[in-house]
A protein has these predicted regions:
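Flavin (FAD/FMN)-binding glycine-rich loop and adjacent Rossmann-like elements that form
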Residues: 1-2, 6-173
Length: 173
């Protein structure tokens, strides 16, 4: 019989004892050129979106006490743009070195710290006068997962399948 586990983290497959993997395999295992030279246990992190709105009038912002000081913790290769929101802030990510199945709540709180801290910086640093009339309209509360368990089956989809657009009769990996 065929079954599709669409629970999100493969809960049904995991509880049934199905073999799975987490993290990236080495380049050598499947001959994937873009894979890392050696396997590692880190995963892609979780993301939370947030949206801003221009109210047309000045709006003050007071960050919650748990907001992160992003001037000390966000890598310097990133910059902030007061007009960016939602999908343009995809890089607001955290949790790749944690257990993305079981630590989602902890990851969510860290993401909130970053988001509220980033908005505090945008609103109150004085570097973004265009943000004076903007408000933080909405902040997500369920992190978007980018990676979790990958179950092993009769066939495992590899990089070449995607790049070469290989056809598979069952269209399932």
């Amino acid at each position: 019989p065929l079954f599709c586990d669409a629970s999100g983290d493969g809960v049904v497959g995991f509880l049934s004892g199905a073999p799975y993997r987490m993290g990236a395999e080495s380049r050598e295992e499947f001959g994937e050129k873009f894979a890392p030279a050696e396997d590692y246990g880190e995963l892609l992190g979780h993301s939370l979106y947030f949206y801003t709105k221009d109210t047309g009038k000045p709006v003050k912002y007071v960050a919650p006490s748990y907001a992160m000081d992003v001037t000390k913790t966000v890598p310097r290769f990133r910059s902030f743009n007061a007009k960016e929101h939602g999908c343009k802030l995809w890089w607001v990510e955290y949790g790749g070195d944690l257990d993305t199945v079981h630590d989602t709540e902890q990851i969510k709180w860290e993401l909130w710290k970053v988001i509220y801290g980033a908005w505090d910086y945008i609103k109150n640093s004085g570097k973004y006068p265009e943000a004076e009339t903007m408000t933080l309209e909405w902040v997500g509360c369920i992190p978007g997962k980018r990676e979790s368990r990958r179950f092993e089956g009769d066939y495992m989809l590899i990089q070449q399948d995607v790049i070469e657009q290989r056809h598979h009769e069952d269209a399932v990996s």
